[in-house]
Amino acid sequence: RGHWDRGFFMRNFTDITDQNFEAAALEMFRYQYANNQVYGKFCDLINRTPKAVKALKNIPFLPVELYKKHRVVTGAFTPETVFTSSATTGETPSNHWVKELAHYEQVYVKGFEREFGDLEDWTVLALLPSYLERSGSSLVAMAEGMIKRSGKKESGFYLYNHGALEKV
């Protein structure tokens, strides 16, 4: 299998348009197949190799169960953080291994701004009860990053402060 190319990943996740989405998705599929051992093996087992996948609708999704049992990553690295799912009692959470938080933030901010415009033009109000009460939530990390980037004094978490939320 191939070598991790961060530049490839960055180009394909920050420069995607409606016009090139399918081509970029197919290119990313081929890249993940070649460089992500868990995903590549899964695709082999279900006979969905790059030779067989020629359209977006045929790209296989990795079952969430594999994120619970395997380290699903592309390339070898020490993660800056590991986000975990909110598993119900007794369940094993799934893991999302993040190499660089700055890169992770760049991707979700660009995605937001592509759809809604400059984040600095928005006030971000976060009311995330079950997420704030546990550690490892990617949603909390995204909300926190967006709150900081918005720069608005009203932006923030309003978990138990409904009175202040009503005033915003």
Task: Indicate where each model-derived feature is located.
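A short, well-structured juxtamembrane/interface segment
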Residues: 160-168
